[in-house]
Regions:
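Long, well-ordered core segments of solenoidal/helical folds
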Residues: 45-68, 89-112, 134-154, 179-201, ...
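Terminal, non-catalytic domain-edge segments
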Residues: 32-55, 291, 306-341
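Hydrophobic helical h-region of N-terminal Sec-dependent signal peptides
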Residues: 9-15
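Bacterial N-terminal signal peptides that target proteins for export
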Residues: 1-8
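C-terminal motif of bacterial Sec signal peptides marking the signal peptidase cleavage site
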Residues: 17-20
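Bacterial Sec signal peptide processing site at the extreme N-terminus
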Residues: 23-32
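An alpha-helical repeat/solenoid feature that recognizes helix-turn-helix modules
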Residues: 65-89, 110-135, 151-185, 198-235, ...
């Protein structure tokens, strides 16, 4: 099972630095949680309740009592909680801020020599807290993203998350003083477009399109559809996702269905403003949200795979996908748009 998970998440390793972080005991779906899912309006299947958000938020805070710098148990949990509207003790966010500021200062502002998604991830969490990414422990974390060559060094994840981070707070790209290629938004967009596969969609290392990478590319491109080449690529990407979707509403890769893939597609649709009941991504009457909630346990956590254990990483992604849905239902700005309420 662990080997399957490593294979399934190969495309995410450089972006999210994922690792297996499951709780000790497995959870089985109860009659109560099954009924809760089945009782959702069949015509919509997209409702996210305040109780669901609150319960999952509480689970995350219990599992991650001291959030700090890190791809699991760090930025993504803080990011989701900050964007959720759920009541979170101010000390929780303050603790994260202090921990990350101290870590950044201790390392001289260098979070990673090669993997610049580390900067993007922190920028997203920092911005979600209403803070300025130009001052994290006394360091401007936007500066590394001004270096185009270093940002794209790790592949497609680099420009995807650079755009999400820069656009989250409508940040200007600083001047690149490293003597390498100056980054621009159009440059990052072009890199993503040039990486599109012949029949649409994206993957980390070529070959067949991967659900997670395709969905994340669409998230990053969402704000650039005034360019016709972007709009066309987005439509091709949506077609790929539609073709990949299973009859139950989920997605399978490397012989395993994962909640994270569903979560990323949900976020992509909300960023694009595409209805979660769009016929292209409803199979057999099963919506994305309905299927995602079937991975949710009675404690509010999410499983990575249908019969798996409660998992921190899966819950972080499942949670912020539900937050994206909730924000869309309330007419609020999208998950990654933090310049508006």
């Amino acid at each position: 099972m662990k080997q399957k998970r490593i294979a399934l998440l190969l495309a995410l390793i450089l972006a999210l630095s994922v690792c297996g972080c499951a709780a000790d005991k497995p959870q089985t779906e109860t009659a109560e949680t099954t009924a809760a899912v089945e009782n959702r309006t069949a015509a919509e299947g997209i409702t996210v309740t305040e109780e669901e958000l609150t319960q999952t938020a509480q689970w995350l805070m219990e599992q991650i009592p001291q959030p700090t710098y890190g791809s699991v148990g760090g930025e993504w949990a803080v990011f989701g909680l900050a964007r959720s509207g759920v009541a979170v003790p101010k000390e929780y966010f303050e603790s994260y801020g202090e921990n990350v500021a101290a870590y950044t200062a201790e390392h001289g502002g260098v979070l990673h020599a090669k993997k610049y998604t580390e900067y993007s991830r922190v920028i997203l969490a920092w911005t979600a807290l209403g803070r300025d990414a130009a001052d994290v422990g006394g360091f401007n974390l936007l500066i590394p993203l001004a270096d185009f060559d270093q940002t794209v060094f790790q592949g497609i994840n680099g420009p995807i998350f650079a755009l999400l981070a820069l656009d989250s707070g409508a940040y200007d790209i600083p001047e690149n003083t490293a003597g390498t290629t100056q980054a621009t938004r159009d440059g990052y967009v072009d890199y993503i477009l040039n990486a599109e596969l012949p029949d649409g969609g994206w993957s980390f290392a070529g070959g067949d399109p991967e659900t997670d990478i395709t969905a994340m590319a669409l998230q990053a491109l969402a704000k650039y559809r005034d360019r016709q080449d972007v709009a066309d690529a987005v439509e091709r990407g949506l077609t790929v996702l539609s073709q990949q979707q299973e009859e139950n509403g989920g997605f399978v890769a490397y012989e395993s269905e994962s909640s994270e893939s569903i979560a990323q597609v949900i976020v992509a649709l909300t960023e694009l403003g595409v209805s979660l009941t769009d016929s292209r991504l409803v199979k057999g009457g099963n919506t994305l949200v309905r299927r995602l909630l079937e991975f949710r346990t009675e404690n509010g956590a999410f499983r990575h795979i249908p019969d798996g254990e409660e998992d921190v990483m899966a819950t972080e992604q499942g949670f912020y996908a539900l937050v994206a849905v909730s924000r869309a239902e309330q007419g609020k700005s999208t998950l990654y748009t933090m310049t508006e309420t």
